[in-house]
Amino acid sequence: MAMRVDQTCGSEEHSPASTQRSAQLFADACAVIPGGVNSPVRAFNSVGGTPRFITSAGGYWLTDADGNRYIDLVCSWGPMLLGHAHPAVVEAVRKVAEHGLSFGAPTPSETELAAEIIDRVAPVEMMRFVNSGTEATMSAIRLARGFTGRAKIVKFSGCYHGHSDALLADAGSGVATLGLPSSPGVTGAAAADTIVIPYNNVAAVEDVFAHFGDEIACVISEASPGNMGTVPPLPGFNAALRRITAEHGALLILDEVMTGFRVSRSGWYGLDPVEADLLTFGKVMSGGLPAAAFGGRTEVMSRLAPLGPVYQAGTLSGNPVAMAAGLTTLRHADDAVYAKLDANADRLAGLLTGALTEAGVAHQVQRAGNMLSVFFTDAPVHDFAAAKATETWRFPPFFHALLERGVYPPCSAFETWFVSAALDDDAFARIAEALPAAARAAAAATPEGTA
């Protein structure tokens, strides 16, 4: 059963008096920004209450405009794996900024970061930097079409690849949170060449290629989806995508905007080394600043302008501040950091399982490396249909019970939880103290209570 979506701006249902400043800031924002936010999931529409306006962060702590502090289990939706305001990253950004923010010209740091990524991810032989994950996937799709001379693309229900028109069809992330099948403004023509099939279903992939094989330019999939909740590929699924696309002369694009350099030094490729033709990156690779990238084998990437005819450009692409933040983050994310991230995810998953089991709540804590999600169901979730069928109405009271006790989880049942390497024993003690009440709130929830 899907949760109710509250489309109002500034609901006070779950907002204690200590959020008065955030409430005022939200009201001010609603007057000049649609919905008061610049990315829909931030509006708390699916959980109710007032979005917390964050004014500072350090390590694993977030501080809001009212002075409330929260243990951060969102990490800016993934990038802050070292923790907030890591001294080395801050210093690198400061040093670069002193010499200028953007030049509209090549800089050495672009080549350095590209070389670092190429060294980590074997299928990537050349890179192009852009400004967002949406740009990365949109550009990769254009390149795949230009390379193959074909028009159709295949994506999976619940996989989110940014908000370009062709990729919004049956997407996850905010589209799932808002209960929208796509988006008004996406024309039939824009989506006509997008084929959407169930995730983790090899037979569906084979069937669509049997019908449209010589028309399909590419298959795009999240390397391990995190935008319908954490729903990892079944063993061999990505390898099957590689096999089927190769058999039909189509390209395989694996979207690692979320998983790239988050789940391992080499991203999801380090855990499941399937050699895609193109990969997309973002979040961690830019250290939390606006930058992303796509890359792949030279034969494909050399079709990009100015070498080839496929056009792609960006005024701020490869800006030196984001390059410095990304390069410093990657160089500090050594094996010890990834071991700490995995251990922290293990610890959080154990606390979640223990509290929810004690409260008698049917649940699944699903993992993809150090990424995880909580689904309120007694069966594993392998696709978007199963994710939408979970008891999502238990999530709002669960979320608010944690928030009111100083723990900041994702504000949607369809988003992934992220840990940082900064989390320590004190943080986990506080999380452990908050979870029993949250689990009891989930247990007491009813569909009518959040309808």
Curated annotation (Swiss-Prot):
The lineage of its organism: Bacteria, Bacillati, Actinomycetota, Actinomycetes, Mycobacteriales. Its cofactor is pyridoxal 5'-phosphate. This is Glutamate-1-semialdehyde 2,1-aminomutase. HAMAP family: HemL_aminotrans_3. One of its GO terms (molecular function) is transaminase activity. It comes from Mycolicibacterium smegmatis (strain ATCC 700084 / mc(2)155) (Mycobacterium smegmatis). It comes from the Bacteria. It catalyses: (S)-4-amino-5-oxopentanoate = 5-aminolevulinate. One of its GO terms (cellular component) is cytoplasm.
